[in-house]
């Protein structure tokens, strides 16, 4: 089993009976002699979606779990269920609207590339989205002529219903790139 200092973002740990996906790691090196380096890890509970934060010493042994990652494409909606199809063997994976409520805010109508499902022991756990997505602004205050890139921000409603802060110079109808995890504007889409 690996030590805490060998854990990387995206790995899955079995900790206190919970499956936790590593979302972020902060390394804190104490200045006192003989003190151990601390690893503050932020997780997402695979089953509940709740955020969890834990601290480990560098030489603490942790239990990792290997999940199966499968590339999927969005297929169709059946009432309250969203069906995704495996890209290789066409296995359907079904999520309820409640299970992927957060992910739906970033998913354009026809789906998006690079989506994956995570499974463990044949059990469907999580729909994982890529880091960024391009979405269209459907509603925002009109763009201000002469507004610079470093100007103030304004709220914008995107095609999926998500509301984020964007620079003042953007207007409705423009496609922008969003960082999914941080829910922030990154720039205009290519």
UniProtKB/Swiss-Prot annotation:
Molecular function via GO: translation elongation factor activity
PROSITE patterns: EFP (PS01275)
CDD domains per record: S1_EF-P_repeat_1, S1_EF-P_repeat_2
Entries under Gene3D superfamilies matching the protein: 2.30.30.30, Nucleic acid-binding proteins (2.40.50.140)
Domain of life: Bacteria
Gene Ontology biological process terms from the UniProt entry: peptide biosynthetic process
GO cellular component: cytosol
Transmembrane spans: none
SMART domains: EFP, Elong-fact-P_C
Stored InterPro entries: Elong-fact-P_C (IPR015365), NA-bd_OB-fold (IPR012340), Rib_uL2_dom2 (IPR014722), Transl_elong_fac_P/YeiP (IPR020599), Transl_elong_KOW-like (IPR013185), Transl_elong_p-like_YeiP (IPR011897), Transl_elong_P/YeiP_cen (IPR001059), Transl_elong_P/YeiP_CS (IPR013852)
UniProt-listed NCBIfam families: PRK00529.1, PRK04542.1, yeiP
PANTHER family: ELONGATION FACTOR P, TRANSLATION ELONGATION FACTOR KOW-LIKE DOMAIN-CONTAINING PROTEIN
Name by which UniProt lists this protein: Elongation factor P-like protein
Organism: Salmonella choleraesuis (strain SC-B67)
């Amino acid at each position: 089993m690996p030590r805490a200092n060998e854990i990387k973002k995206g790995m899955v740990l079995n900790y206190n009976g919970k499956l936790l996906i590593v979302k972020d790691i902060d390394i804190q090196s104490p200045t006192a002699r003989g003190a151990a380096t601390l690893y503050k890890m932020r997780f997402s509970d695979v089953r509940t979606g709740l955020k969890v934060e834990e601290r480990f010493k560098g030489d603490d042994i942790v239990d990792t779990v290997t999940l199966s990652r499968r590339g999927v494409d969005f297929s169709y909606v059946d009432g309250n269920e969203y069906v995704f199809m495996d890209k290789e063997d066409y296995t359907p994976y079904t999520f309820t609207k409640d299970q992927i409520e957060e992910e739906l805010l970033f998913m354009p109508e026809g789906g998006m590339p690079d989506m994956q499902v995570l499974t463990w022991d044949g059990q469907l756990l999580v729909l994982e989205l890529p880091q960024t997505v391009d979405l269209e602004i459907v509603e925002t205050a009109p763009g201000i002529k002469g507004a610079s890139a470093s100007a103030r921000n304004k709220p914008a409603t995107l095609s999926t219903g998500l509301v984020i802060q964007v620079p003042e110079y953007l207007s409705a109808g423009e496609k922008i790139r969003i960082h999914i995890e941080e829910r922030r504007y990154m720039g205009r889409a290519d």
